[in-house]
Amino acid sequence: MDIDVLNMFLVAGGTLLVPLLAFMTSFLLWPAALIRIYYWYWRRALGMQVKYSSYGNYKFCYTARGKPGNKPSVLMLHGFSAHKDMWLGMVKFLPKNLHLVCVDMPGHEGTSRSALDYYSICGQVKRIHQFVESIGLNKKPFHLVGTSMGGNVAGVYAAQHPTHISSLTLICPAGLMYPIESKFLKQLKVLEKSGDNQRIPLIPSTAGEMEDMLRLCSFVRFKIPQQVLQGLIDERIPHNEFYRKLFLALVDEKSRHSLHENMNKIMAPTQIIWGKQDQVLDVSGAEVLAGSLRGCQVEILENCGHSVVMERPRKSAKLMTDFLSSLQSTDNHKKHD
């Protein structure tokens, strides 16, 4: 009897041990695969469905939750070398009754990458306009959100297509003339003088460089296991040549100050969110936008770096939700007057 009981525990223990060993082996040997599983799980948990749309031969990949309703739909544009899933932390805290759309920017993740594509800000705005038309998002004005590179694209889109945009949230956007030069922009100047475009801090190729990039982008010091860092690098390395091409297009004269050159054409109510300790794009950019956009709402987050959406997802979601609610309240008052 005792032997039977012992065997039962051994069988039970073995049953539990097999998946545990499989997990440990996967973690050690295929960390990139586990990162993909992680995003798949959170998309599923949050009700974000992966979808595709086409404009001619060009394919867009995006995630969506909900359907268009009385409130404006929300389109979210990620930053350089990121992807649609970077918004998941913020999506978790957004109201379930909002129609959300997070698209992979041109050349990123599941969206087409073409050698013939023009990756300047104007080129990306054109592609995002095609995406908007392909899913019929512009049937009525929508709220547009963008961070970093995506903020640059969002701002220029709002300037060029004012009738499409009900309101705008720019999170530490690129494309401005910043009164104070950031740590990253200083590093960039040194690289430009030397003619070295292989050591761009935002394009890491080792786990150590990945750690340096995270320290540059984030005020919060996340404790990330070495295997996860390696997984992140394994995911990025096949795309680094594209990221380099894209980066050079973004810092070219035609794109570097695109938002600055177009900000006076933005008509939509605008919200600006910036991390006070941003080392990539200095927070002084918020003053530049506030000086040009009449009545815009500025939110500066203490103890927060460039990766606002990753560092402060709950706060970012609340600020955007409150902003949208205040606009709806203003519209309701106008209707009753």
Swiss-Prot record:
The chain crosses the membrane at residues 20-42. The active site is at residues 148, 278, 306. GO terms for cellular component: AMPA glutamate receptor complex; late endosome membrane; lysosomal membrane; membrane; mitochondrial membrane. Residues 1-19 are extracellular. Gene3D superfamilies: alpha/beta hydrolase. GO terms for molecular function: monoacylglycerol lipase activity. It comes from the Eukaryota. Its EC number is 3.1.1.23. Pfam families: Abhydrolase_1. Keywords: Endosome, Hydrolase, Lipid metabolism, Lysosome, Membrane, Mitochondrion, Signal-anchor, Transmembrane, Transmembrane helix. It catalyses: Hydrolyzes glycerol monoesters of long-chain fatty acids; 1-octanoylglycerol + H2O = octanoate + glycerol + H(+); 1-decanoylglycerol + H2O = decanoate + glycerol + H(+); 1-dodecanoylglycerol + H2O = dodecanoate + glycerol + H(+). SUPFAM superfamilies: alpha/beta-Hydrolases (SSF53474). Residues 43-337 are cytoplasmic. GO terms for biological process: acylglycerol catabolic process; lysobisphosphatidic acid metabolic process; monoacylglycerol catabolic process. Its main location: membrane. It is a single-pass type II membrane protein. It is found in: Late endosome membrane; Lysosome membrane; Mitochondrion membrane. Residues 72-313 form the AB hydrolase-1 domain. PANTHER family: MONOACYLGLYCEROL LIPASE, MONOACYLGLYCEROL LIPASE ABHD6. Lipase that preferentially hydrolysis medium-chain saturated monoacylglycerols including 2-arachidonoylglycerol. Through 2-arachidonoylglycerol degradation may regulate endocannabinoid signaling pathways. Also has a lysophosphatidyl lipase activity with a preference for lysophosphatidylglycerol among other lysophospholipids. Also able to degrade bis(monoacylglycero)phosphate (BMP) and constitutes the major enzyme for BMP catabolism. Belongs to the AB hydrolase superfamily. This is Monoacylglycerol lipase abhd6-B. The lineage of its organism: Eukaryota, Metazoa, Chordata, Craniata, Vertebrata. The gene is abhd6-b.
